[in-house]
């Protein structure tokens, strides 16, 4: 399979900060998935690093567009750290376009992207990359174990979806953007790209174990299809 993994920055770079052993744990899982015969591409979010730089930028009077650029640079730093851990399985350059990522993939290596354009989340980048390279599966690794109707970290009665359509995902993202206190695992732009491209998506808890499970066809999360 050709698989795009979308890793939230908070998954790879948690609040307590980056740890080399944790990064290597993820790298080893991706190496294993590739060794099993899959083609692997990765998009990494900015996490704590991006949030801190964006906050400082705003305090210093930077425009939102400039803060977006700070966030993009942070995602690329995270991508470069993962590339370093991947060693010969990747190329020591963060691709900044889908064409470049596909070229690396076609060379038998693992491309690791960060952000690309101001205003676009790395979720949207991952969905666009999956569409561009005609991926068989987009895996979204988050800090929760699937898509819920509201934030399960805040609401005990949050309902998890085992399966849903892309249109249902879009509707949920719209609803979440309008309701105070609500949040969607997948943002609206990414959801619309998923719907447009008719992508098959698995939303799972972004642990190394669950990412490996997905490559084996075991999805302990939400499947989005159709």
From Swiss-Prot:
Protein's cellular compartments: Cytoplasm
Bridged cysteine pairs (disulfide): none
SUPFAM superfamilies found in the cross-reference section: Carbamate kinase-like
BP-aspect Gene Ontology terms: 'de novo' CTP biosynthetic process; UDP biosynthetic process
Gene3D superfamilies: Acetylglutamate kinase-like
Subunit text: Homohexamer.
Protein's name according to its UniProt entry: Uridylate kinase
Species, as recorded: Methanocaldococcus jannaschii (strain ATCC 43067 / DSM 2661 / JAL-1 / JCM 10045 / NBRC 100440) (Methanococcus jannaschii)
